[in-house]
């Protein structure tokens, strides 16, 4: 309820009772912080309560009625708004919200008795012997509030001249019981001589500070950790308070951490998360614009199913931002560079989108139709948004913008010519200058669309050197669930095929070919099958003589068991040696254990020639043969037959 209504209503009622002193009485009540609820109770309560209160205030102010003779006070009343009563013992009179005054009576000029507004409500007085001593002036609050008001002293005996008491304490307790609906009967927990609203400064003086009877003193004083003020800070709820910790309002927010508009106000971290979500939505919107631009350039379908969902998502986001009390651009004041780039890219995207909704007109210079005529004609195909024809004497071109790109396709499919006001009009598709990409850029853009790599920057290459550290929007955010699953399956199949190919190369074994001199000759050099040589053939002649027959036979047999390759026929070797011992290369036959057929093998005449004999006997053919074959042979100078199993056994 408005405080002005309660005050004016109470003032009107007091004027009806005390027309001369009504301003003083209402001013006294307002100076001592009577709450709106208290004033309204007095204004709408019984008239006896108001008369008792008026009499009490008049006694405090030292105002007496003309029909009631009163004794002249020996000393003026020390009622002063700036008076500060000293904080002494219990014998001294102290006030909780009101100034002390002393009223001298003829019978006892110096006798005083402390009383408070609490005593009036509780029905006790300083000189009343029937009141329990454990109840003190500050022990009973008003409706769970600590009562700190209207304390004064008055005479303990009746006024001799008046013939009656000014106010009966018990009667005042009954009359003002509405102020003590939920009065507690607890014992004192603090020193009764120290009022709750007293504050002591460095000089030991007390200060009176009380806001209202209807306001909780503990909440006002900041005992709950807010530091002052019962109202939340509006600037903090919007994200920033320039006063910081020194702000007199609460930086805590409403219940459930929400303010009146539903915005999180007490958690800067949550506000940062909200800003981050907003930034991600801006990136998503920018990527969507670039995707639509690429689709229009390459002549793809105008709208896919996920694009409709993106339109709905962006529309919901725009509606949510429009409902904010501080607008959409407030978050981006700290990052103008990024915001400008995004706005520029979106503006370019909007322009490109508008290009698909426009057509180019050519007509004779002597045409007389107006913009309205063009709009009326093309409205037959669809909604016309704008018509632009230059204001020239000889005009020959113009532009028409439609609300939907599909209308442009319908107009172009209609063909030429069109007749507007008997003028021949030709329609052509609208193309922006400087927007045509070269073939390389179109291929790159097509690859990005197929792979789903959409960059948030506005460059066609997808590279922004000024913002390389920013993350790019993932491709899977723009695809449906089935498309994502298909891509995952394809990726898994590709990885599986790569793994199988890698294992095949590691364990590569070439198949055996029969009756092929060349393949059997190069078998030992294939991948995965190293070449094996006979132990007896690699030994020197001196070491061979030291071996006895049994040892040599054992070595040869072990070699044959480990490596079942075609074995050299000893008889063929001896025959070849006897027939062509002087030749540089000897030809011997290989015996294939499986088929029993013989394979002709070219053997070098000398594997380790001397330095002098190399120049004389080494030719191009022998050098090529020595590089391909690694089988041991006999020395050329001695012309000894090669060591075989038959020779060792002899």
From Swiss-Prot:
SUPFAM superfamilies: RNA-binding domain, RBD. It holds the Pfam family RRM_1. Residues 105-128 have a biased composition (Low complexity). Residues 357-433 form the RRM domain. InterPro entries: AtC3H46-like_PABC-like, AtC3H46-like_RRM, Nucleotide-bd_a/b_plait_sf, RBD_domain_sf, RRM_dom, Znf_CCCH. Residues 581-590 have a biased composition (Basic and acidic residues). Residues 141-154 have a biased composition (Polar residues). Disulfide bonds: none annotated. A zinc finger (C3H1-type) spans 232-254. Keywords: DNA-binding, Metal-binding, RNA-binding, Zinc, Zinc-finger. One of its GO terms (molecular function) is DNA binding. Residues 67-162, 566-650 are annotated as: Disordered. This is Zinc finger CCCH domain-containing protein 55.
